[in-house]
Structures are given as structure tokens and as C-alpha cells.
Amino acid sequence: MQPERSIVTCDWLVVAAALSAITAILAGAFAAHAMTGKPVEWLHTGMQYQLAHSTVTMGLSRNPMWRRCAWIMIAGAAVFSGSLYVMALGAPLWFGAITPVGGVLMVCGWLCLAVKEVSHRA
């Protein structure tokens, strides 16, 4: 018999990855059906990065050694893509200054993964 699960014991990293993937899919659908011009490019760019990092996060969530790296990646994808999404929806263009912060976080997540793997093997 399996123990009962509750919202307290659920895997929040998996929840974050799933919600991130849903957001990316909705952004892509919105871009395809309701937008034109430069905002479409912003939505597509955000969607691609967010969907890729959501998928990677889901895979990394199963290894305790890599979970911190996955959290960094998913946070970076949220900041990167989120800033592009809000600009596409009409927010001031200065939100574009936030986008590189998300990119740096995604890179840091990948670097974290590489360092943990190398140090684990050493």
C-alpha cells in the first residue's frame, strides 16, 4: 500500500516544470492566433526557451543531485520568458533589461549541472 500524498508532499519541482510547460504552450498558441508583428517573435522566443527548460527540468527532477540546478534553470526560464511575454502584451520595453538576467540564470543552471556531474565523478 502506498502512503497517501498531499499537496504538502507533492514534488514542487515537477509542478513548476508542468506549469511552465503549460505557460509556454499557451504563449505559442496566443502568438499563432492572436498576435502580429514583433510581439509574435518575443512570444516564440520565450516559448522555445521555456518549453526546452521545462522539459529538461522534468528530467532532472528525478535525481536529487541535480534538483538545485533544475530550480535555477526553471527560474531562469521564467524570468527570461516572462519578461518577453509581458513586453509582447504591451508592457514597457524596459522589461527587456530583465531578459538577460533570466538568460544568465539558465546558463548558471547548466553550469551547475556540469560542475555537479564532474565533481561527482572525480
Residue ranges and their predicted role:
Residues 1-122:
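Polytopic transmembrane helical bundles with strong interfacial aromatic enrichment
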